[in-house]
Amino acid sequence: MYGSARTISNPEGSPSRSPRLPRSPRLGHRRTSSGGGGGTGKTLSMENIQSLNAAYATSGPMYLSDHEGVASTTYPKGTMTLGRATNRAVYGGRVTAMGSSPNIASAGLSHTDVLSYTDQHGGLGGSSHHHHHQVPSMLRQVRDSTMLDLQAQLKELQRENDLLRKELDIKDSKLGSSMNSIKTFWSPELKKERVLRKEEAARMSVLKEQMRVSHEENQHLQLTIQALQDELRTQRDLNHLLQQESGNRGAEHFTIELTEENFRRLQAEHDRQAKELFLLRKTLEEMELRIETQKQTLNARDESIKKLLEMLQSKGLPSKSLEDDNERTRRMAEAESQVSHLEVILDQKEKENIHLREELHRRSQLQPEPAKTKALQTVIEMKDTKIASLERNIRDLEDEIQMLKANGVLNTEDREEEIKQIEVYKSHSKFMKTKNDQLKQELSKKESELLALQTKLETLSNQNSDCKQHIEVLKESLTAKEQRAAILQTEVDALRLRLEEKESFLNKKTKQLQDLTEEKGTLAGEIRDMKDMLEVKERKINVLQKKIENLQEQLRDKDKQLTNLKDRVKSLQTDSSNTDTALATLEEALSEKERIIERLKEQRERDDRERLEEIESFRKENKDLKEKVNALQAELTEKESSLIDLKEHASSLASAGLKRDSKLKSLEIAIEQKKEECNKLEAQLKKAHNIEDDSRMNPEFADRLKQLDKEASYYRDECGKAQAEVDRLLEILKEVENEKNDKDKKIAELESLTLRHMKDQNKKVANLKHNQQLEKKKNAQLLEEVRRREFSMVDNSQHLQIEELMNALEKTRQELDATKARLASTQQSLAEKEAHLANLRMERRKQLEEILEMKQEALLAAISEKDANIALLELSASKKKKTQEEVMALKREKDRLVHQLKQQTQNRMKLMADNYDDDHHHYHHHHHHHHHRSPGRSQHSNHRPSPDQDDEEGIWA
């Protein structure tokens, strides 16, 4: 009845047919009746209707590329399922299923959907949000009232239909009884009416064909209604899923893109549904034409029945066969008139049903609700069942007429029995007249009911005017939506500008982080230099301690010698005769001492030569080391291009900071120990001064002491030169070590080959240091031996050496204080820079988290959009290659987006884990080292997203 749809060419000329709608079985019949006119006559063909339904069903989510490809027959963004279109609001807006089913159409977004859209995205102001919550409640009240009215009307119509069915059953029983009486009273005189019966049989065959076609069309419409119901269910499921997704993301800020394309899409949808309305009206007119043809066939049947009734009524005596035939035909005509009257009533009811369908159709355009669509479907099914029952009754009547005609051919021998039956029939005719009167009364009742229905139609027209006003309100809301779309577009542009500013700010922060890491590296190098200086000072302090110990031993030897000399002086005073022998022994001792001094000079010259040779060898080794360092520098310059990420460097800095703090603690403890040792040495020096004062009281050895002082000064000069040379070599070594440390910072991230080279270099430098320390120890031992031998004869030189040692100790203390001050300043600067670094890292983390969140939201929106498109393409149940290729392409895009989403979530989880580790490490270090500088943390915040994440410009576009 309303599901026969046929194809018409697209605006571009490519015919497309809805894949879900089965083809009408009345195609050939309708073509013959319409004369092949697709849209020229009063009614459009079903192909035109179906093609227009398919042509206007392609309004999906519009993109920039859709404007270029509208003329094509492939639909990558929308679907083509029986006049339906899927409109998705961007970022989790409510999905509305709009369709053009037979006599059920929806125009664009419904008012409730528009308001729900504004409810979801209307969080820009409190008053606007409150207003958006008030409007849907009013509309719900209006909708509920209209639904209640429609339900009441439907109940009344159902009651009327039940009454009509009962009346038809009663009339069918009456007609059956009359037909039985006609069969019993039939006579063979009606052989004359065979020609009429043949015509009637031809008409009946035509009517049967029409009834069969109408029955097939009813089945076809039931199939279409079931398909539409399935699509409605799937669309509701999709709406439910998308509403859940939008509800899950309701707490987050949305990026609404209600642009001009969306507004154009809504206008196109509105125009499409207006055209669908026009087509549905055409289908209704076509159905009215079909009803008129059925009326004509029923009128023809009524005429034949009237003739039969007149013939029956005209039957009287057997001698008056013609009069009897006329009477029978008259009675048959009366029965047919009753049937025609009932059919007229049926036609009126069908017209009323059509008007009600139009009204419901208009209401469904304004407010397409699933409850209304269900109610309309139930009404349609009821009407279909009513039509089917009427058609069955008509078939029964036709069968009875044929049986009457067949039974009309009787033999002349049975005429007497028929005369008796005619008398019985006359009695029955009286009964039929009374029944006719009752039917007339019932007709008057039906007329009163028709008046009531007219009043209902007037109320429905009033409601239609209200709906028009509602449409005007919707137009005003559309204009408001356009303004809001422009505002949202400006906000989107502003957000994009903010994103660009944040990216530039992130780049600046990364540059600042790199500069700070470089400054931190330089400060770490300075701290290492300080540590090296502290080590040198410790070595000097150790040498001085050894010298002091040697001097103490020499003082003890001198004390013993003094006691011996005193004993000798006493022996000389007691025994003057032994003076000559004592002088001889003294001269021999002096000669022995001179020989010993000469031997010591020769040994010192040999040691000097050996020392010079070793110094030259050390210089050669230093040159070789410098050449190797230059080669390593060349390799480093070649490999500096591969130094991209600073994580390992930051972790090495953190470990170095921890080691540095531990070394500083150990150095502070060592300095305190050295202070205590210096105090002890000062006390010992005081004792030595007292002993020297006692030794100066002896004037006999003054000349000898002067000579020994000269020799000691000469030896001191030589030792000073050697010490200066050693210091120069140590400075060279420090420079080499500083260069090595600077290079170690860069070499830490290079390959294992450079690491092995640097390990070998470190070993060589350590060996060189060890050799130099051994050389220093040898020189110190030689000097100590020389000084011991000198101090065995010279007491005055001890005082000078002790003064030199005190001066050296004071210098080392001053240098230690200076290094402590420098260390404190560097620690403060490092703490400040590390705090600045921590702030920069926190800002960078926050910005990275915001960017990752925005990218995840964009990916989720894109994935949900792809899922919706895939589901709608799969629901279309089309086996065309184009749709399958579109589904496969959408699935590939969805897989790619899901892969990107997984990468984003992994990066975000990694960033969160790094933040947790950094915070935990910072808290632990701050808890255990509250009075010290916190070490540099690993630079996990420098983690950048993978290049795959930056390939998502399509999402941000």
Swiss-Prot record:
Protein name: ERC protein 2
Keyword Phosphoprotein: yes
Main location: cytoplasm
Biased composition (Polar residues): 1-13
Region (Involved in binding to RIMS1): 760-957
Composition bias, Acidic residues: 948-957
Gene Ontology annotations for the cellular component aspect, listed alphabetically: cytoskeleton; endoplasmic reticulum; GABA-ergic synapse; glutamatergic synapse; Golgi-associated vesicle; growth cone; neuronal cell body; presynaptic active zone
Tissue spec: Predominantly expressed in brain, including hippocampus, cortex, cerebellum, amygdala and olfactory bulb.
Name of the gene: Erc2
Organism for this UniProt entry: Rattus norvegicus (Rat)
Subunit structure, as described in the record: Interacts with BSN, ERC1, PPFIA1, PPFIA2, PPFIA3 and PPFIA4. Interacts through its C-terminus with the PDZ domain of RIMS1. Part of a complex consisting of ERC2, RIMS1 and UNC13A.
Keyword Coiled coil set for record: yes
Keywords from the named record: Cell projection, Coiled coil, Cytoplasm, Cytoskeleton, Phosphoprotein, Synapse
Stated role: Thought to be involved in the organization of the cytomatrix at the nerve terminals active zone (CAZ) which regulates neurotransmitter release. Seems to act together with BSN. May recruit liprin-alpha proteins to the CAZ.
